[in-house]
Amino acid sequence: MYEYANRFAALGHQVTVLHSLRRPFKKMRSPLWWKRLIFVIRGAARPAWFSLDSRVTSKIVDEFSDSFVPDGDILFSTWWQTAYALAKLSPRKGVPVNLVQDYETWTGQEDLVKSSYRLPLQHAAISNWLRVLVEKESGRSVQLLPNAIDTSRFTQTVEPALRDNFSVLALYSEESRKGTRYIISALEPLRAQYPGLHFSFFGVYPRPASLPEWVQYYQKPTNLAALYNQHAIFLSASLGEGWALPPAEAMACGCAVVCTDIGGHADYTKANETALLIPTENTTAIITALTTLFDNKAL
């Protein structure tokens, strides 16, 4: 959403990003005054990890209500809980648009998530599989607003033919739905078959103890495009995604891609043409797909 905010600001629109301390259906574990204080101390109103345009107003509010939301033309919600808050706002706040970025059921409350699609809002989805899902639940047409990548940043700088054919990169995550455990299970069998295997992970976490010593790990890499360009293959074993950015970024940087056959990869992958697609939760399939690429450099 910060990228959207920057792009809108560049077009001359007045943009405000609101971060709410309270959310519908989420119980607060600490007093409101304490949360306010912590957010101020952390400087959380503006992201430290993203270069937000100085023309964008970004602030912390107690809640998404008429008292805290400024009048405007269009208002976006980016999480199912905040969609409920949008539905209660005055028309003066703008046309409410619920931007669905994933099937957000990993914290439970699936019935409430589905019900959010039936709220009297304009609904938009970032991928075709989400568009179909929301249309089915809402009974209304849903606007497709697909994700995109910055091809001025993510571009091929090293010819694939010059890369190590046995170099593989993957995202490390401790979220079970990302499927990292299936990748880790494939590492030693692959290395036994290909002693020259060079496997790398990147992620936000400190290096996990579960990784073999021979595996390279990059924590919060500052130049992700360069990292993609250092590898011949990108691997994603996600069980579910809204519209996954890393495989698309890797493609733009010239990597061959192996990824799971899920909706979040479907908008930019075509089996055996733009990617090798594998079933979820399947270590054997990971090994087979990588073996195919290792043994067929032309692919």
Tell me what each language-model feature is.
Residues 239:
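Aromatic "clamp/platform" in nucleotide-sugar-dependent glycosyltransferases that forms part
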Residues 124, 160-178, 184-191:
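Conserved donor-binding/catalytic core segment of Leloir-type glycosyltransferases
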Residues 256-259:
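Short hydrophobic beta-strand element within catalytic cores of glycosyltransferases
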Residues 244-247, 265:
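Short glycine/serine-rich donor-binding loops of glycosyltransferases
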Residues 203-225, 233:
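Nucleotide-activated donor-binding/catalytic signature segment of Leloir-type glycosyltransferases, i.e.
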Residues 105-111, 143-164, 226:
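Acidic anion/phosphate-binding donor-loop and adjacent secondary structure
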Residues 62-72, 103-137:
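Membrane-proximal helix-turn-helix segments that form the acceptor-binding/catalytic region
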Residues 271-272, 276-283, 291-297:
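Conserved acidic donor-binding segment of nucleotide-sugar-dependent glycosyltransferases
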